[in-house]
């Protein structure tokens, strides 16, 4: 009987030990998979958009706090770089700001730029390549071509760039101030710090990037979607007449389709034309924009950087165009001046138009 009890005791402890080892191994694997080679444990927005994080973290209020609220304990401490902690400690010692307020500023800038950047809503993103990235190859391709079909596989013409250039990745930035008296008052009275200036700077860089994407920068030799040579140009009809907007978009999509582009198509218009689309279409009971959205399933957007009433229809896809991003927008500390503190919202990007024939402007 004693031997039976001993054997049962051994079996129980063997099973318990096995599961304990399995749990330790699993925890280490989870930690390494979540944070391996990542020095941005507390700054997930540097690489991911809100939509991406929402898809993984459903019904999780992570946005109101740092990411390590959920991904804490074993992994974060090992991967969160000492340099980053030391950098914040230096900033904190100079401006007397706590980490919660610093993260609040960073989150506000990220969410504001994500809300206001129109080009990034339909353009493929190439990157982020890193803060130090200063240039990127720019290949130009011809019209889409059919694949070959035969018995021996000898007649296929490979897709290749017609030419290659080097595109410079430019810094886009706007500075703002936080005043020493405001910071001290916020800390002493335990009131929220006013970050209106940071949000204003975020809106400013968003408009500048969209201006580069749509209008280009002629002084730097950067074409925009509305100015690229080789694009398709069609006449814009009077959209104040109900139905004309829809018909124009149909003709633009027809034009791109006839040249071999299958979509998805996206439409960007000026605010005035966007407002015209929000009227009930004749005897249908539907808004005109509803029919447009069924036609251009890549999205319908308005942009405030359009210099005139114009409509832009493009065939999206990285083969046709993309946005090369060096670094996403974030806040950097400039330094003290006159006892106040200067910050900079900064990022870097450049538009790469690889096939201008995939663009159709109605003007």
Swiss-Prot record:
Q: Where is this region: Encapsulin domain?
A: 95-363
InterPro entries for this protein: ENCAP, Encapsulin_nc, Multihaem_cyt_sf
* Predominant cellular place of this UniProt entry's protein: other
Q: Where is the signal peptide?
A: 1-36
Q: Which GO terms describe its molecular function?
A: heme binding; metal ion binding
Q: Where does heme 2 bind?
A: 67, 70-71
Which of this chain's residues are annotated to bind heme 1?
Answer: 44, 47-48
In this chain, the stretch annotated as Linker covers: 75-94
Which keywords, in A-to-Z order, does the entry hold?
Encapsulin nanocompartment, Heme, Iron, Metal-binding, Signal
Region Diheme c-type cytochrome: start-end pairs = 37-74
An annotated GO cellular component of this protein is:
encapsulin nanocompartment
Subcellular localization is given as: Encapsulin nanocompartment
Q: Where are the transmembrane segments?
A: none
For this chain's record, the cofactor binding note is:
Binds 2 heme groups per molecule.
- Listed cofactors: heme
General remark: In the signal peptide was removed prior to generating the constructs for expression in E.coli.
NCBIfam families recorded: encap_f1 (NF041155)
The family note in this entry says: Belongs to the encapsulin family. Family 1 subfamily.
Function, please? Answer: Fusion of the shell and cargo protein of a type 1 encapsulin nanocompartment. Protein missing its signal peptide makes 33 nm particles in E.coli (called cEnc), protein missing its signal peptide and diheme domain (residues 1-86, called Enc) makes 29 nm particles. The cEnc nancompartment encloses c-type heme. The cargo protein NIR-HAO (AC P0DV45) is probably targeted to the nanocompartment by its association with the diheme domain in cEnc; removal of the diheme domain in Enc halves the amount of cargo.
What is said about its interaction partners and assembly? The encapsulin nanocompartment is probably formed by 180 monomers, with the N-terminus (diheme domain) inside. There are 36 pores where the pentamers meet as well as 3-fold axis channels and dimer channels.
- Per its record, how is this protein called by name? Diheme-cytochrome-encapsulin shell fusion protein
Species, as recorded: Kuenenia stuttgartiensis
């Amino acid at each position: 009987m004693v031997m039976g009890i001993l054997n049962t005791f051994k079996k129980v402890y063997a099973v318990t030990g096995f599961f304990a080892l399995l749990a330790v191994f699993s925890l280490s694997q989870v930690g390494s998979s979540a944070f391996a080679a990542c020095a941005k444990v507390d700054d997930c927005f540097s690489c991911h958009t809100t939509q991406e994080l929402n898809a993984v973290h459903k019904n999780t209020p992570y946005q109101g706090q740092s990411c390590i609220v959920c991904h804490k304990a074993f992994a974060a401490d090992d991967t969160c770089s000492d340099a980053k902690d030391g950098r914040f400690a230096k900033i904190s010692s100079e401006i007397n700001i706590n980490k919660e307020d610093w993260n609040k500023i960073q989150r506000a800038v990220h969410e504001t730029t994500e809300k206001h950047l129109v080009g990034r809503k339909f353009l493929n993103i190439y990157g982020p390549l890193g803060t130090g990235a200063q240039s990127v190859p720019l290949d130009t391709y011809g019209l889409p071509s059919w694949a070959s079909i035969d018995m021996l596989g000898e007649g296929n013409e490979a897709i290749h760039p017609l030419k290659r250039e080097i595109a410079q990745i430019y810094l886009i930035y706007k500075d703002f101030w936080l005043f020493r008296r405001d910071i001290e008052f916020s800390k002493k009275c335990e009131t929220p710090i006013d970050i209106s200036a940071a949000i204003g700077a975020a809106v400013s860089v968003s408009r500048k990037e969209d201006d580069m994407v749509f209008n280009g920068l002629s002084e730097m030799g950067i074409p925009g979607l509305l100015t690229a040579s080789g694009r398709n140009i069609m006449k814009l009809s009077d959209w104040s007449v109900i139905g004309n907007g829809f018909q124009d978009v149909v003709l633009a999509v027809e034009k791109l389709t006839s040249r071999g582009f299958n979509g998805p198509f996206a439409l960007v218009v000026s605010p005035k034309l966007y407002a015209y689309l929000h009227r009930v279409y004749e005897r249908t009971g539907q808004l005109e924009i509803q029919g447009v959205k069924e036609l251009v399933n890549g999205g319908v957007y308005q942009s405030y950087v359009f210099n005139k009433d114009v409509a832009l229809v493009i065939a999206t896809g990285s083969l046709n165009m993309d946005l090369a991003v060096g670094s996403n927008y974030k806040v950097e500390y400039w330094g003290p001046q006159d006892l106040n503190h200067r910050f900079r919202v900064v990022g870097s990007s450049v538009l790469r138009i690889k096939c201008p024939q995939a663009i159709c402007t109605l003007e």
